């Protein structure tokens, strides 16, 4: 299988379940959503330049780095035909695979895999313009190794995040994060909201890579 890879690089995980740890990133081209605040819009376009790499080439690259944490992102990785084969190959070779998905595509097949990766579902809040695409039935597949994150840009976003966390009892199933749209709502306000609402088990998360490097820099 051949994959359109917008970029591949080694860095630290800037967010989610392995934040701060070294990781290999594979960013695939193409996404089925168009979020208003998306910080990787360039990778969503079918015109985005991409390396066309086979399963074998990608797995050889990842394994050759010597880094065991692997983040498959995009774009939307679950749009990629052959993604299950790639995940299985990586995990059979000792990699810890995390799938960053926008939450609009069923995770049933991934959940049933003998070599199951960790999921990070990105619930799209009202300011994204894409909330109607969210497939909340995916939450029945959540395990302790998984995460749901809420990227918030407004007070309405925070209110909706609290509602979804409560409705689906997410903190009882997996890690839960609220993070600010970079340059938008202040992290301090998110902390205040979490304390006001007694959001036990919910974590504030900042995109570490945007504080270490230029927020617009790619490949980090």
Each model region followed by its residue ranges:
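Solvent-exposed, non-transmembrane amphipathic alpha-helical segments
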Residues: 25-29, 46, 162, 168
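Conserved Radical SAM active-site core
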Residues: 3, 7-10, 22, 34-116
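Short aromatic/hydrophobic contact patches that present stacked aromatics
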Residues: 25, 69-71, 147-149
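Amphipathic, alpha-helical segments enriched in basic
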Residues: 1-6, 10-13, 33, 37, ...
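Conserved AdoMet/S-adenosylmethionine-binding subsite of the radical SAM
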Residues: 59, 78-220
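Flexible, acidic/Gly-rich N-terminal and inter-domain linker regions that tether
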Residues: 1-29, 33-37, 41-42, 197-203, ...
